[in-house]
Amino acid sequence: MHGAQPVKPNALRQKSLIRAALALVVIACGLSLRWYGFPLGLPAFVVKYGGSLLWATMVFLLVGVLLPRLSPMQIAIIAAAIAIVVEFSRLIHAPWLDAFRLTTAGALLLGRIFSLWNLVAYLIGIVAGVWLDGRVASFAQDRILPRHSKLNSQQAGSTRE
């Protein structure tokens, strides 16, 4: 039978856990960049757009956690749609929304000022997320799955009994 093999629940769970762990690392990097970037003397460009890049990578990974059966390309499309909606929502100025944007959580989640350059940073961040997801998937396949296949090949080779 040709075609895609059915995805096992344990593999989906493992993929989601890896993506969640990566998302936590990306969040820590993003917060560190925002809080310590200027005191460390990093250029404003790096702090601003590096944070946007990491935000989009986080969105990609979290969409992957929530929808593990989707392909990385499908996850990227959804993450890009979320990023575009969030960026263009900055053009909407309702009092309650502007008040939320003034909070730390609002600034980190939604941002404050519309910028087309953010869309470029988001695209790069999503591409980075696809790349990272692929590297982790190949690492997991090379490191985790072969244990089971080696065991099965050893069992198959021990039929001399």
Regions found by a protein language model. Give the residues of each.
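Bulky hydrophobic segments
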Residues: 1-141, 152, 161
